[in-house]
Amino acid sequence: LPDDGLRVLVSGPRVPATLVSIPAYPSDAPHPDEPTPALELTDVGLALVAITNDLRGRAALIQRGQNNFSQKLEFAAAAGAGFAVVRNNQGGTERLYMGGAETQFTPIPAVFIDQTSGQALSEYLRQNSGVTARLSLQKAIARLTVTNTLQVDHVRLRARFAHARRADVRLTLVSPAGTRSVLHHHNSDTSSPLGEWDFHSVRHLLESSAGEWT
């Protein structure tokens, strides 16, 4: 299975090798389970106040610090950004998970990258125009075809993991109708393995069971 698979993919003139595919942590904002469009990336600094730039058709690079994540992301979304990349302001290669109830109401995908990558990306944007980025998740897909046609009440999925950090694991289930259940997501528990679990979802209520589940 891919590990550390959430990436910011950068395209532009002579992109440094260290910026082509930047590892990122997700947030409690919408998760890019499918790749986002490649959008021109704009550095908006700290985003302490409402952003006056028109970010429609663009993505925002935001520096951590002084105000909370949810406010920064709200400003980016209000300016029209398609997604946001928040860069750390300390810690070198350290990354944080942008969690919390307020962040869950952010309408755009948002990820967090480390200070070293973020500073290099900001400098690259300063020196080059037309730089684009997209969010992409490296993932393994298992397919299960159900031939019985039943009306779904709830779904149970048993999964077994061999991974030392449950914090890293994201597990989703997509029905033939296209409804996605998030069964396990990134979290702050970095000290224990996930092992084997039964996951339950009622998001597929009244859907047909027949077809391919992934």
Show the residue positions of the predicted features.
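Loop and turn regions of beta-sandwich accessory domains that flank beta-strands and are enriched
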Residues: L1-P2, Q138-T214
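Structured lumen-facing ectodomains of secretory-pathway proteins
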Residues: L1-V146
